[in-house]
């Protein structure tokens, strides 16, 4: 049976986005990136990164006198899992109500709709083969 990684909190996801952008980061790198948007303590960032390592999202390596961190899974894979977990938890596993909410709230652009149609066509053709 596949074991799921624990869900990311809002702050953890912020940290992961910084690391995915940079590839490899120190606590200071992440702290400075987050500090540009809001006030946060260095020790908070360090604690959160240690938690992310314990959860299995980050790998820590020593480089010179500092530790560097890198993601253990690609951003797309993590987000896919988060969306799947959200749909399961909120919509009992059905994506249809989610799509209806997005369409009703007009959060989907024409470009997004074109991309969705293209993906649906490709998915439908793949199932026919």
How does the language model describe each region?
Residues 5-11, 63-82:
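Short, cationic-aromatic polyanion-contact patches
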Residues 13-19, 99:
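Hydrophobic residues on short alpha-helical segments
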Residues 18-26:
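Short capping segments at the starts of secondary-structure elements
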Residues 25-34:
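Short acidic, hydrophobic short linear motifs in intrinsically disordered regions
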Residues 46-50:
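Short, hydrophobic-biased segments on the C-terminal half of alpha helices
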Residues 56:
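Glycine-centered, phosphate/nucleic-acid-interacting loop/turn motifs that mediate DNA/RNA or nucleotide
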Residues 74-99:
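Conserved segment of winged-helix/HTH DNA-binding domains
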Residues 81, 104-129:
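C-terminal regulatory/oligomerization modules of transcriptional regulators
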């Amino acid at each position: 049976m596949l074991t799921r990684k624990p869900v990311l909190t809002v702050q953890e996801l912020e940290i992961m986005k910084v690391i995915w952008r940079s590839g490899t980061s120190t606590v200071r790198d992440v702290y400075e990136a987050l500090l540009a948007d809001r006030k946060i303590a260095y020790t908070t960032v360090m604690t959160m990164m240690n938690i992310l390592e314990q959860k299995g999202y980050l790998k820590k390596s020593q480089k010179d006198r500092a530790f560097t961190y890198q993601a253990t899974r690609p951003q797309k894979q993590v987000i896919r899992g988060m969306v799947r977990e959200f749909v399961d938890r909120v919509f009992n596993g059905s994506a249809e109500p989610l799509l209806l909410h997005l369409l009703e709230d007009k959060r989907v652009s024409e470009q997004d709709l074109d991309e969705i149609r293209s993906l649906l066509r490709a998915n439908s053709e793949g199932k026919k083969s």
